[in-house]
């Protein structure tokens, strides 16, 4: 068990810095953090950001894009439009209950975040176009 899992199990939450680029444009490495809490697989839904453990032990933070049953979930990083992974419910360690983005605390109740989530989940082809436009701005 690593420090993140230990904190979630013992304290009931963990605040973790973002690493990697798979959750751009929402979450940026070196700038943002995610607040995680234990989750009940029965309450997980499309759009939730979850921390799961891959078979090799790597921890990954991605968004649920499909829930067909309560046994498996399809997850994908916000900065991706292909290579979605099918995750067993037992691999899911925690769910994001909030984010520290540019120093501000954001939750499911934050209006702009709800809009972002709807847009981001609506269509993977649309996501590809948005990511292409955002990469041109750099």
Each model region followed by its residue ranges:
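Extended hydrophobic leader/signal-anchor segments used for secretion and membrane insertion
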Residues: 1-138
């Amino acid at each position: 068990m690593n420090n993140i899992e230990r904190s979630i199990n013992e304290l009931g939450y963990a605040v973790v810095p973002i690493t990697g680029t798979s959750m751009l444009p929402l979450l940026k490495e070196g700038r943002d953090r995610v607040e995680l809490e234990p989750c009940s697989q029965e309450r997980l839904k499309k759009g939730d950001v979850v921390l799961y453990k891959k078979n090799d032990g790597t921890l990954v933070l991605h968004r649920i894009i499909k829930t067909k049953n309560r046994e498996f979930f399809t997850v994908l990083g916000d900065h991706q439009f292909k290579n979605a992974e099918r995750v067993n419910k037992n691999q899911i360690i925690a769910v994001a209950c909030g984010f520290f983005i540019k120093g501000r605390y954001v939750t499911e109740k934050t209006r702009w975040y709800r809009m972002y989530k709807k847009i981001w989940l609506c269509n993977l082809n649309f996501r590809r176009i948005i990511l292409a436009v955002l990469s041109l701005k750099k």
